[in-house]
Amino acid sequence: MRILLTNDDGIHAPGFEVLEDIARELSDEIWVCAPAEEQSGAGHSLTLHHPVRLRQLGERRYSVTGTPTDSVMLALRTVLEDKQPDLILSGVNRGANLGDDITYSGTASAAMEGALGGIKSIALSQVYKRDAEHELFDAARTYGADVIRKLIDAPFGDRTLININFPPLPADKVRGIRAVRQGFHDYSRGSVVKGRDPRGLEYYWFGLYAIEHTLDHGTDLEAIDEGFVSVTPLQLDLTQHSLLSVIGERFE
């Protein structure tokens, strides 16, 4: 099995080392194509207004001066053009990608790009607490390969990806694994801090600490809160089907 690895924290991020360890438990043919620098919050953006450079760092290992989406696109259209991967893994993100985080997540969007290319794609994220005493990626490192093994043969369907989050616990405290739906974050409560630079000019800095979420039953947010690994299938068809006929009647 040929596996392509990418992320949004950058190719030198600690979580990416964890992803490589996970991938080695699954296959001997690992390819890397990831952003050269931090790209958190890049979403599904493409670099359109300046050139992107692809740099080979070693055997089957490349960095990209662009976004996670750039990285996957370049890998599929250049490095792996004649030998497409069987699986794309994106992560392991340092931090949660739960609920509406998906909208902003470069980690999830890299997997989305893979799904658009018809390739099974999985995003992995490690939820963490700043005051935790255990090794940050312990749960992801311990559970990652086993969770992926159980998903590889699953019928993903067209334009579908899997989003996995690991709880902020030592591996021996994780309660299990749950298949759950996407939850809800209230991003309207996110903070915007206003300041002035040394020249006296105004600037704004976005923060996420004030975001609230709802622990609805059967959601990824609830699963993580209760100490479970969350596994959520996501589809790229964003159509609100129940509203489609209602709107259609207005144009008949």
Curated annotation (Swiss-Prot):
A divalent metal cation binds at residues 8-9, 40, 93. It is found in: Cytoplasm. Its EC number is 3.1.3.5. GO terms for cellular component: cytoplasm. Pfam families: SurE. Binds 1 divalent metal cation per subunit. It catalyses: a ribonucleoside 5'-phosphate + H2O = a ribonucleoside + phosphate. Coiled coil: none annotated. Transmembrane segments: none annotated. The keyword Disulfide bond does not apply. Its cofactor is a divalent metal cation. Keywords: Cytoplasm, Hydrolase, Metal-binding, Nucleotide-binding. PANTHER family: 5'-NUCLEOTIDASE SURE (PTHR30457), 5'_3'-NUCLEOTIDASE SURE (PTHR30457:SF12). Nucleotidase that shows phosphatase activity on nucleoside 5'-monophosphates. This is 5'-nucleotidase SurE. It comes from Erythrobacter litoralis (strain HTCC2594).
